Structures are given as structure tokens and as C-alpha cells.
């Protein structure tokens, strides 16, 4: 399986890397990082002064193999972690161009807000209302979507195993 290479990650951080973009779950393989792996990333990032931007946009599609841990729920993650989330993938709201950038550290949040203002990035009120409605009232929809995707995945895996045994999945 796909594993995080912590030795290489630390070497990169030591070399002066200032920002890490992490997908959780990983896209495209769908791997949900363990709480322990994420905690280790946070600890290394704090040690070397690296900001971790954790893209959690696919978190709603967790197939249940491992419980999703949100990066900001981890000890000391609030110091240098940014969490990105959105209902655009889960609820097909991409046209509303809505997402959330959650930053617990007030100093870092201020820097990001300043850069967003310079770039004329402003909240989208229609998107914000739609995203809120999706997360407050969309559980039944999301459950059905996840089940549909799971069935498609299972069908594809069975087909490949039966008809294309040269491909290992």
C-alpha cells in the first residue's frame, strides 16, 4: 500500500521547505491517513517551522476503511496547520465556487486574510448558504452517494480481478 515516507519528509523539511500540501484522504488513491501518521507530520512540521495545508475536500467520500481524522483535531496542529474543506465535490456545488479555509492560528489567519484581500478574494454568499444547507441537511444524500461510489468501486475491482488478472489491485 501507499505509505508516507517520513525519512524523506523530514529531509525535505530540514532542507528549508516552508509549506507542505497534504491531501487527506489522498487523491487519487483515497487513502485515509492514520491519526498517528498525521500527528507525526504535525510534529515534524512544528519542529522545522513548516506550514501544513491539509486539503480535506474528499473527506466526505470516506468508504469507512479507516476513520477520518481532521488535521486541526490533532495536538499542536493549530500552530501551523490550515484545513481546506468544501461541499463542492460531495454535493456537486462546484459552480458556486465555495470552500472553507480554516486556520486556528490568529497570526497565520491574518496573513492569509491579507493576501486574500490583495487578490480581491471575497466570500460568496450564495455558495456559503448552499454549503451550509448541504452539511446541515444532506446526510441522506451523502450516504447514498458514498454507497453508489462503493458499489461502482466494488464492481470495477471484481471486473479487473476476473478479466484482467495481470493488473493487481
Model-derived features with residue positions:
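Active-site phosphate-binding strand-loop segment of PLP-dependent enzymes
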Residues: 2-65
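Alpha-helical elements of Rossmann-like donor-binding domains used by nucleotide-donor carbohydrate transfer enzymes
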Residues: 4, 8, 12, 16, ...
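Alpha-helical scaffolding segments of alpha/beta enzyme cores, especially the outer helices
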Residues: 36-43, 107, 155-158
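A short helix-to-beta-strand connector/capping loop
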Residues: 48, 77-80, 164-165
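Structural signal for well-ordered, non-membrane alpha-helices
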Residues: 49, 150-153, 157
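Conserved core segment of the aminotransferase class I/II
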Residues: 74, 79-150, 159
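Conserved PLP-binding catalytic core of the aspartate aminotransferase-like
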Residues: 149-150, 163-169
Amino acid at each position: 500500500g501507499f505509505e508516507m515516507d517520513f525519512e524523506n519528509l523530514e529531509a525535505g523539511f530540514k532542507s528549508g521547505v516552508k509549506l507542505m500540501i497534504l491531501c487527506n484522504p489522498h487523491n487519487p488513491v483515497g487513502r485515509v491517513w492514520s491519526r498517528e501518521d498525521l500527528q507525526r507530520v504535525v510534529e515534524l512540521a512544528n519542529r522545522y517551522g513548516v506550514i501544513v495545508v491539509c486539503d480535506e475536500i474528499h473527506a466526505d467520500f470516506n468508504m469507512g476503511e479507516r476513520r477520518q481524522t481532521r488535521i486541526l483535531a490533532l495536538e499542536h496542529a493549530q500552530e501551523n496547520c490550515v484545513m481546506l474543506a468544501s461541499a463542492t465535490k460531495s454535493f456537486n456545488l462546484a459552480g458556486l465556487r465555495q470552500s472553507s479555509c480554516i486556520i486556528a492560528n490568529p497570526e497565520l489567519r491574518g496573513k492569509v486574510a491579507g493576501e486574500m484581500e490583495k487578490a480581491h478574494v471575497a466570500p460568496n454568499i450564495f455558495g456559503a448558504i448552499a454549503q451550509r444547507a448541504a452539511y446541515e441537511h444532506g446526510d441522506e444524500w451523502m450516504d447514498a452517494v458514498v454507497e453508489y461510489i462503493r458499489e461502482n468501486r466494488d464492481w470495477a475491482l471484481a471486473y479487473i480481478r476476473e478479466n484482467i488478472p495481470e493488473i493487481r489491485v
